[in-house]
Amino acid sequence: MNTLNDAAATQKSGPAHYDPDEWALRCALANCYHLIDYMGWTETIFNHISARLPGDAHEYLVNPFSLNYTEITPENLLKVDIDGQKVESSPFDGNPAGFALHGALHQARDDIRCIIHTHTTPISAVVQKKNGFDHNSFYGAQLFGRIGYHTFEGITLYEHERPRMVASLGDKHILALRNHGIAVAEGSVAKAFFLLWTVQRAAEVQCAAGALPGDDNPLPLPIQEKCAEQTAMLIRDSGFANKFFDAMVRKMKAETGRGW
């Protein structure tokens, strides 16, 4: 297996009216939606994942609102502009609650190519706590210095919240939405999925540890910093995330027989 562009994560060729790069991105994003459902991280038809298309137009792909994640295919993904307006005809509309978040981050950061927003129970529980994520587990340490926190202002429907979300994220790749959920923002679909998996594991371990008696064994600050730097390097400089994503797609398809 090579990369997500020609391995299990995509189909090798698509309809003639699609540019090959766009079709590869559509396939990767559709597989990501199916994976999020497979992992049990969905909230029925809610939440959203976006992938920015190549070029300077800041157009991106996102899920049609009303479809289950398992019903999403490469062809029924919406193509929208930075304000959430459809740029291609579709019988579906998007979720207005997603446009402010995704549009703001895609417009502000050219290094961001995929954003996954969800609120699993462990993640929502952790971001409800005043101190948010700790960094004392194997997974939590990998997130040290990589999380921006954003104060809950209600459902993200309004453009006036955009600059504050951008400021809260800064140069980081994880936006913890206090009392709400999480948005991970990375340079590819595979990288974003791997980062979300790490965040989810950190939240699960933190919740489990918090339910046990006794004090935590805190990790020294230099170890937390080292773990975060190592993980960032693996995501940035290697095919680590692609290998993980492709393997998870193969596992999902082997166990569920999913396709489109």
Locate predicted features.
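Divalent metal-coordination and catalytic microenvironments
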Residues: 51, 105, 119, 165, ...
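A general structural signal for well-ordered alpha-helical packing
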Residues: 102, 123, 162-166, 189, ...
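A conserved C-terminal secondary-structure "cap"
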Residues: 2-32, 173-260
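A contiguous binding-surface segment within folded domains or other stable secondary-structure elements
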Residues: 148-184
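Class I SAM-dependent methyltransferase SAM-binding "motif I" and its flanking Rossmann-like core
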Residues: 121-163
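An anion-binding catalytic pocket shared by soluble metabolic enzymes
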Residues: 15, 23-116, 123-134, 140
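Short, intrinsically disordered, mixed-charge
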Residues: 107-110, 131, 167-170, 197-201
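Short histidine-centered catalytic/ligand-binding loop motif
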Residues: 18, 89-92, 148-155
